[in-house]
Amino acid sequence: MSAKPSVGFVNEASRQILAGGSAGLVEICLMHPLDVVKTRFQIQRCTTDPNSYKSLGDSFRMIFRTEGLFGFYKGILPPILAETPKRAVKFFTFEQYKKLLGYVSLSPALTFAVAGLGSGLTEAIVVNPFEVVKVGLQANRNRFTEQPSTMSYARHIIKKEGLGLGGLNKGFTATLGRHGVFNMVYFGFYFNVKNIIPVNKDPTLEFLRKFGIGLLSGTIASVINIPFDVAKSRIQGPQPVPGEIKYKTCFKTMATVYQEEGILALYKGLLPKIMRLGPGGAVMLLVYEYTYSWLQENW
């Protein structure tokens, strides 16, 4: 049987971008309600606040009762607009960094982790302005029909705070940390463990093998990177005192949260984050791999 002709860079890149974008779109549509709940937990500061959520179940009940079903989809437009290019960048840059690192004397295990770190830092640059808008909309507790539109809220931020690190790009260093650390662990764990556990000939068991490794990858990465996520939400969300900026930089915000609220405050929203990015991480990897394989065969 004759070998397939070599695939040009443009075709290969197009497949990676399309598969990555598809993975992001599917994941955000399935998992966004948990992202809303996670953000709400991260920006609440004390349990004595009458609006604070007592538990995961309580948050779902309160949001549904006071804001309706669409309350769970607040802020979904920015991630939908961002997820396709964001995940496309995530997977495309991971593959490209991995290829570049092939010229360096790194072990395969370390190559996956370093390529993941590079892809996360690149992804953060693309996504941060969308994250600022998303967090602001998710923090709004009015009914879905009463909150500002995505574009009007973005214009409000630009007009009031500008485009810089105090405005549409605030929380940039925290976003770099969040995405860099997550992708480093996520890709590093997934591909290293997948290479260790033997491939199963049964398609169903092989699917479950990949899903299980992806689930663990997303879960472990979430546990490790959540302090950056909490810092990002505090910086990008509403400040405790209107007109006074309390949370400014990533590590100073972490230190402030730790000093005032304790170490566990840096892990606020961990359960909904794991519930979202555990299975969501598995979904992304599987959608990417199966879509990429389909594109290789059909395009």
UniProtKB/Swiss-Prot annotation:
Family: Belongs to the mitochondrial carrier (TC 2.A.29) family.
Function: Transports dicarboxylates across the inner membranes of mitochondria by a counter-exchange mechanism. Can transport 2-oxoadipate (2-oxohexanedioate), 2-oxoglutarate, adipate (hexanedioate), glutarate, and to a lesser extent, pimelate (heptanedioate), 2-oxopimelate (2-oxoheptanedioate), 2-aminoadipate (2-aminohexanedioate), oxaloacetate, and citrate.
Identification of the protein by name: Mitochondrial 2-oxodicarboxylate carrier
Location(s), subcellular: Mitochondrion inner membrane
GO cellular component: mitochondrial inner membrane
Primary localization class, coarse: mitochondrion
A GO BP entry: lipid transport
Membrane topology: Multi-pass membrane protein
Keyword Zinc: no
InterPro entries given in the database record: Mit_carrier, Mito_2-oxodicarb_carrier, Mitochondrial_sb/sol_carrier, Mt_carrier_dom_sf
An annotated Gene Ontology molecular function: antiporter activity
Keyword terms, alphabetized: Antiport, Lipid transport, Membrane, Mitochondrion, Mitochondrion inner membrane, Repeat, Transmembrane, Transmembrane helix, Transport
Listed transmembrane segments: 17-37, 62-82, 100-120, 179-199, 211-231, 274-290
